[in-house]
Amino acid sequence: MKTLMKHSLVAAAIAMGVSGVAMADNDEGKEGRGCSLSTLDGMYIFAATGHIIPASGPAQPKAIVEWIRFNGDGTLSSAGATRSLNGVIAQIPSSNGAGASYSIADLVPPGGGCMGTLAFSASGPNFDLFIPPKGEDIWMIQTNPNNVFQGTATKVSR
């Protein structure tokens, strides 16, 4: 009887261990681990502040609030923006995203987040992207010369 009880306990422990591993794998998938273009899919609101540094003259402050739609396939478009450059406000109309693209890669070790790049057009502006595994927020920094400009894009809808 003792032997039967021991075998039953061992079998139960093994079964629980196996189901725990299966659940961990399932949870990992739910968190969106692993980076791909589809990590960014939906409408985001981007808000950033910083400065542009002209070739001559002092640095000028700039800020933007912009709608960005990531299509989950490496393409994106802007649904419009408001920009302030040295206190001059401009409304920027929506664009169809022609020439706009982004790329994404896993950080090392995988599962810790993603890193990517974004180009609004062939001539810029260009950004480096830092993305948590679920892609709900994106930290962005402009990489064009003579710019000190960074902000966050937050997912607002799919």
Q: Residue spans of the language-model regions?
A:
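Mature soluble binding/inhibitory domains
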Residues: 23-158
